[in-house]
């Protein structure tokens, strides 16, 4: 269920990447682009944290920022093992 929800949330991002973004010149100052960052963050971290990371990234992407390489942060290790692992 979780993977399906993640894919559903990423669907509008993919629509933007393939249908809307090609109509405009490249403007993102970061690598990967903000849309690619959003899709990767949601798939890697889940919907809530992924959208939070994406929102922070989009707010940082403006004409006065330096830009550059800004990858999605790695998933932090779990502090406690889940009950299913025992």
Curated annotation (Swiss-Prot):
Query: Which residues lie within the region annotated Disordered?
Result: 66-86
Gene Ontology CC annotations of this record: plasma membrane
Q: Give the membrane topology.
A: Peripheral membrane protein
- What does this chain do? Could be involved in insertion of integral membrane proteins into the membrane.
Q: Which UniProt keywords apply?
A: Cell inner membrane, Cell membrane, Membrane
Which is an annotated Pfam family here? YidD
Q: Which PANTHER family match?
A: MEMBRANE PROTEIN INSERTION EFFICIENCY FACTOR-RELATED
| Protein name listed in UniProt | Putative membrane protein insertion efficiency factor
Instruction: Identify its protein family.
Output: Belongs to the UPF0161 family.
Which compartment or compartments is the protein found in?
Cell inner membrane
């Amino acid at each position: 269920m979780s993977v399906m929800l993640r894919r559903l949330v990423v669907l509008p991002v993919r629509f933007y990447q393939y249908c809307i973004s090609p109509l405009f010149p490249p403007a993102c100052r970061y690598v990967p682009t903000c849309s690619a960052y959003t899709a990767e963050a949601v798939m890697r971290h889940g919907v809530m944290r992924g959208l939070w990371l994406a929102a922070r990234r989009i707010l940082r992407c403006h004409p006065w920022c330096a830009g550059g390489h800004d990858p999605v942060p790695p998933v932090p290790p779990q502090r406690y093992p889940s009950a299913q692992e025992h």
